[in-house]
A protein has these predicted regions:
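C-terminal boundary of histidine-terminating zinc-finger modules
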Residues: 120-135
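Conserved catalytic-core segment of NTP-binding enzymes
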Residues: 5-8, 12-13, 19-120
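Flexible phosphate-sensing "switch/lid" loops adjacent to ATP/NTP-binding sites
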Residues: 1-15, 20-22, 28, 32, ...
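Generic structural motif recognizing short loop/turn segments at the entrances and edges of beta-strands
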Residues: 84, 122, 158-160
Length: 168
């Protein structure tokens, strides 16, 4: 309903944020909508990496290209002193990307400013476009856009199948 009964107008991209893993949402979407690619988002801890690996496997099985991996909450930045601490582990996403032959798109910190800015209605790239956090998001977005632009275009799923019959 969200995809078929909403007038999206002219979009350059439609990004769908899905829950982790390989549930019905991911499978149904990949079977009913032509998907350009998947960006895998994980946190560095082992249990999250297992879920992310399952997601990668599912997307590969249904023929959805993996555009790369983002490591979310890669490091906690203290709002008082700026100290950086890897409270969920370090480098799990980078290792997973390397072992799985995926591009590592970048790491996002666990930073209270991200939540505060989003809750105020002005995400980091709007609230502080020159800030370090915004620059991380923008670099990831530019990399994904470039990867999409480099893909060969397959519009076959957008057109109905036409059958010509000799019976007239």
């Amino acid at each position: 309903q969200l995809l078929r009964q909403t007038n999206w107008k002219d979009l350059d991209y439609l990004i769908v944020d899905m829950p982790p893993g390989t549930g019905d949402i991911q499978l149904t979407l990949s079977q009913r909508v032509p998907i350009t690619g998947a960006v895998i988002v994980t946190t560095p801890q082992d249990i999250a990496l297992l879920d992310a690996k399952k997601g990668v496997t599912m997307f590969q099985k249904v023929g959805v290209p993996i555009l790369g991996l983002v490591e979310n909450m890669a490091v906690h930045i203290c709002s008082q002193c700026g100290h950086a601490e890897h409270i969920f582990g370090e480098g799990g996403g980078r290792r997973m990307a390397q072992e799985g032959g995926m591009d590592y798109l970048g790491a996002l910190p666990l930073d209270i400013h991200i939540r505060q800015q989003a809750d105020s209605g002005a995400p980091s790239v709007v609230a502080d476009p020159q800030g370090e956090i915004a620059q991380r998001y923008l670099q990831i977005a530019r990399t994904v856009a470039a990867k999409i632009a480099q893909q060969s275009k397959d519009f076959s799923a957008k057109f109905p199948t036409i059958t010509v019959s000799q019976d007239t």
